[in-house]
């Protein structure tokens, strides 16, 4: 029942099937968990799709994970998605949880272009030092690398590159480097 903060990717979706299975099998309530989705498709201004749109990450997470947990699920008010309004609140919310004793777990993979979330390697060129880069907590309307777009076309858009958004909201190293544990 200790507080737990988790930064989650939207995929691979298969891992959520197993998480749901074990949470239900072991009858573990997630009422002590607060989640932060690491990214979301957005336009260059950071505006995201409605959460009811089948292409939105929030919709995907609700369908594949939260809704399937039933009464054991993470309470809706403890689910955070990378919208223009909510992503800037992540640093403060995570800091508060950690000050209350929560552990921060980061679940991630490294993309083909060596990105974590949609934090692309070419962003480093914009910072004068590594320390400055490490402080950046998020980016709204981040421009994605062409190989990231290609990777997402293959994995999520049936290889239709023109359907993949070129920008997204994403967490940055100022958040993912705070993790107490990584998976």
Where are the language model's segments positioned?
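N-terminal glycine-/serine-/threonine-rich phosphate-binding loop
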Residues: 1-6, 24
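Glycine-rich beta-strand-to-loop/alpha-helix junction loops that act as flexible
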Residues: 8-13, 108-112
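A glycine- and small-aliphatic-rich helix-loop capping segment at beta-alpha/alpha-beta transitions
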Residues: 20-30, 52, 121-131
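Ligand-binding beta-strand-loop-alpha-helix segment within the catalytic cores
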Residues: 28-107, 162-163
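Glycine-rich phosphate-binding loop
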Residues: 99-126
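Class I SAM-dependent methyltransferase SAM-binding "motif I" and its flanking Rossmann-like core
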Residues: 117-167
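C-terminal functional extensions of proteins
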Residues: 162-183
């Amino acid at each position: 029942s200790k507080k737990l903060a988790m930064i989650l990717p939207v995929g691979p979706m298969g891992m959520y099937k197993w998480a749901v299975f074990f949470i239900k099998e072991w009858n573990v309530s997630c009422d002590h968990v607060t989640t932060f989705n690491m990214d979301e498709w957005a336009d260059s201004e950071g505006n995201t799709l409605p959460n009811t749109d089948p292409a939105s990450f929030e919709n995907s997470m609700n369908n594949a994970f939260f809704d399937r947990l039933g009464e054991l699920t993470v309470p809706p008010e403890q689910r955070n998605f990378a919208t223009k309004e909510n992503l800037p609140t992540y640093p403060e919310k995570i800091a508060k949880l950690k000050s209350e004793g929560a552990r921060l777990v980061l679940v991630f993979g490294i993309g083909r272009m060596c990105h974590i979330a949609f934090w692309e390697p070419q962003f480093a060129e914009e910072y004068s030092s590594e320390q400055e880069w490490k402080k950046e907590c998020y980016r709204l309307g981040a421009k994605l690398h062409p190989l990231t777009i290609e990777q997402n076309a293959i994995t999520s858009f049936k290889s239709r590159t023109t359907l993949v958004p070129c920008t997204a909201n994403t967490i940055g190293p100022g958040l993912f480097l705070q993790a107490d544990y990584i998976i």
